[in-house]
Structure formats: structure tokens, C-alpha cells
Amino acid sequence: MANDNGIKHFIDLSTVPATELRAILEDAKARKARLKAGEVERPYAGKVLAMIFEKPSTRTRVSFDVGMRQLGGETIMLTGSEMQLGRSEAIADTAKVLSRYVDAIMIRTTAHERMLELAEYATVPVINALTDDTHPCQIMADVLTYEEHRGPIKGKTFAWMGDGNNVLHSLVEAAARFDFNVNIATPKGSEPKSQYIDWARANGAGIMSTTDPEKAASGADCIVTDTWVSMGQEDHARGHNVFIPYQVNANLMAKADPKALFMHCLPAHRGEEVTDEVIDGPQSVVFDEAENRLHAQKAILAWCLQDRGLGA
């Protein structure tokens, strides 16, 4: 998404055209290949990425930090307690000030609206590294991972098990952008937000919703799940018992296509949403997903910065 000043923000998969998302994905593949071949790329030497963390993280922090360093740049981390974003200082003012210091801003926060307001007033690119509503960087890594293992994602079917959370919202947006299908199995009361499903369907995604996990898994090319309780939402969580039928185990995987992959954004609660047998099994690609956060996010950073004349 570009604002009125022509700044490219990576807000959601719905805000970036399909052609540009495909270009980012192919760039991620190329950058990964060059890194594995030992090539050193430093197009953003001297550039700085501000990383705002109002929700803690391992994968997001390390992958963005390492990614920016591999591109030749530097990072500075700002925690929620340090920032007091929107409390001691207006978000608009923070956005304007940071834009005078750094070349891009990454934010991992709670309310989606806080990230949107930051992007509205920033004069440098803003990257959504996670909100309570969406997780677009993770899904770019997931699409990259699927295509590495199984080829083009077009026409394939992903099956989601469990809570209708932020990762699922970005997954259905990806289904519209990359032309694949999503079967959603959630217990009643844990469905995804309707605006994400409605947008995905209106933009060509095949979305099926059910309370039956076996129906959703039937013939699927990939089974995806996440924790039953999202970070920071423990006080509002439903009892685990309602999710037990949605555990990804060997019996559920057997309903999918024999070549189906298993994905999880991690961290996983082993023995809850997924069994050890599945997450450690031959169909699991969870650690490839984790690695691919690095490569996908490097390509996202490059996409955000290229049009500003900052490297390639």
C-alpha cells in the first residue's frame, strides 16, 4: 500500500496488489538462493530499521534484525514500555519523529488500528510484523515454504484447524492474492472475523467454513494450525476442551492428501494443537517456515525501500 506521499507500506496482503506480492515472493526465493551460495549483499548499508515491539517475540525480532543486517543495514529495537505509544505521546507524533531518524519502521503490536495510524503519519515505510488482526509476514513465509516443497500454490487447498485468529485472517487474504483455497474448521464462537472472509471471497478465494475438522482436512494439500490461545489474550481465552477435536494428529493428517504438508507459525504447544508425532514427522515443514521468515522479510524490506532509491 502506498500513501499519498508514495511511501510503500506493507500493511496487509489485501493492501498490496497480487502482482507485487508475487514479485516479493520471487525476490525472496532469489535472495535465499544467493545467500546459500555465499553471496554477500549490502544494498542498504547505513540504513536503519526501527523495530517496535509491544508484543514480545523470538522469531520476529531475530529474523528482522538478521535480515536487515544481511542487507547491510542496522536495527534499533524499541519496546512498548520504552515507547508508551499512544499514551505519553500521540502515535502520529511518534510516527513523524521516527521518520526523521530511520529509513523504515517495523511494528509488532496489539490493536490493528495502532499500526494503521502509525503508517498514516509516517513518512518512511511501515511494516506490519503482527497485530491482533493479521500476520502478513508469516503468511508470505508460508507461501514461500509451500512452493519450495510442492511447487506452484495456485489451485491448492489449505485446511486451517482451531482458532480463527490473526494468522488465519492473513491466510485467507493470501488465498485471494495467490489463487488458492482455504478450508476452515473452527468451533462455534471461534470463527474468523467476517470482514476478512468476505474480502477474500469477493476477491476470488475459495473459502469453506465448517465445525468438522475431518471435512476441512479431506484431500487438503496443507494442514495449518496455531496455538489455541494467542499471546496476550489468555484472559479472554475459551476453555481448551472446545478445541480438542481440532488437534492435528496422525488421524487428522491421514484425511489430507498423502503429500500434504503440516505448517505451524510457532511457538507450538505440543500435545495441544499438534502432537509430537506430526510436528516432528516427515510432513512437517515448521522449521523451514521459521527460516523463511528471514528470506520473506528481506524481500519485503527491499520492496518497501527500492522505490525510495535505497539499493536493490
Curated annotation (Swiss-Prot):
Q: Which domain of life is it from?
A: Bacteria
Q: Which residues bind carbamoyl phosphate?
A: 57-60, 84, 108, 135-138, 265-266, 293
Q: Which GO terms describe its biological process?
A: arginine biosynthetic process via ornithine; citrulline biosynthetic process; L-arginine biosynthetic process
Which EC class is the enzyme in? transferase
Q: Which InterPro entries match?
A: Asp/Orn_carbamoyltranf_P-bd, Asp/Orn_carbamoylTrfase, Asp/Orn_carbamoylTrfase_sf, Asp_carbamoyltransf_Asp/Orn-bd, Orn/put_carbamltrans, OTCase_ArgI
Any Pfam family matching the protein: OTCace
One cellular component term (GO) for this entry is: cytoplasm
Q: Which UniProt keywords apply?
A: Amino-acid biosynthesis, Arginine biosynthesis, Cytoplasm, Transferase
Q: Where in the cell is it found?
A: Cytoplasm
A GO molecular-function term, please?
amino acid binding
Keyword Cytoplasm applies: yes
Which EC number(s) does the record attach to this protein? 2.1.3.3
Q: For L-ornithine, which residues are the binding ones?
A: 166, 226, 230-231
Kindly state which reaction or reactions the protein catalyses.
carbamoyl phosphate + L-ornithine = L-citrulline + phosphate + H(+)
User: What pathway, per the record?
Assistant: Amino-acid biosynthesis; L-arginine biosynthesis; L-arginine from L-ornithine and carbamoyl phosphate: step 1/3
Give the protein family. Answer: Belongs to the aspartate/ornithine carbamoyltransferase superfamily. OTCase family.
Its biological purpose = Reversibly catalyzes the transfer of the carbamoyl group from carbamoyl phosphate (CP) to the N(epsilon) atom of ornithine (ORN) to produce L-citrulline.
Q: What is this protein called?
A: Ornithine carbamoyltransferase
Q: Which organism is it from?
A: Brucella suis biovar 1 (strain 1330)
